[in-house]
């Protein structure tokens, strides 16, 4: 589950890599999107935003990093448990970081 999440994050943060190619099947394979019939190189000079928490070449967290993004992630580390990451709205309580994830807990719906 975490590896899938990291791949999703890295693909979102690093959508274009100089060595990547777009092929015609839609499958992600190593550092390219695969389409079987046609190969189209990505444009040169495509924006490559830097995220110090995520290694774009491997799509994994950099050494010492616990997270790459999220309301409970600060400088590649989980924020301490108890910090408010989403203020109360209506009948919902404040949402607080768990200290074990970079994501703010999901909203709970009460009947």
Swiss-Prot record:
One of its GO terms (molecular function) is toxin activity. A motif (Cell attachment site) lies at residues 89-91. Expressed by the venom gland. It comes from the Eukaryota. Disulfide bonds join 53-76, 67-73, 72-97, 85-104. Residues 45-111 form the Disintegrin domain. Residues 1-20 form the signal peptide. Keywords: Cell adhesion impairing toxin, Disulfide bond, Hemostasis impairing toxin, Platelet aggregation inhibiting toxin, Secreted, Signal, Toxin. It is found in: Secreted. Pfam families: Disintegrin (PF00200). The keyword Coiled coil does not apply. GO terms for cellular component: extracellular region; plasma membrane. Its main location: secreted. The keyword Translocase does not apply. Residues 21-44, 110-111 form a propeptide. PANTHER family: ADAM A DISINTEGRIN AND METALLOPROTEASE DOMAIN, DISINTEGRIN AND METALLOPROTEINASE DOMAIN-CONTAINING PROTEIN 28. Heterodimer with piscivostatin-beta; disulfide-linked. Inhibits fibrinogen interaction with platelets. Acts by binding to alpha-IIb/beta-3 (ITGA2B/ITGB3) on the platelet surface and inhibits both ADP-induced platelet aggregation and platelet aggregate dissociation in human platelet-rich plasma. Belongs to the disintegrin family. Dimeric disintegrin subfamily. This is Disintegrin piscivostatin-alpha.
């Amino acid at each position: 589950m975490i590896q899938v999440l990291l791949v999703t994050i890295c693909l979102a943060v690093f959508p274009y890599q100089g060595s990547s190619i777009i092929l015609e099947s839609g499958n992600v394979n190593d550092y390219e999107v695969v389409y079987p019939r046609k190969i189209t190189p990505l444009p040169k000079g495509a924006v490559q935003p830097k995220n110090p928490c995520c290694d774009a070449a491997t799509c994994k967290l950099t050494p010492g990093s616990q997270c790459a993004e999220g309301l409970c992630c600060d400088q590649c580390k989980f924020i301490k448990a108890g910090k408010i990451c989403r203020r109360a709205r209506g009948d919902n309580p404040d949402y607080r970081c768990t200290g074990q994830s970079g994501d703010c807990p999901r909203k709970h719906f009460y009947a």
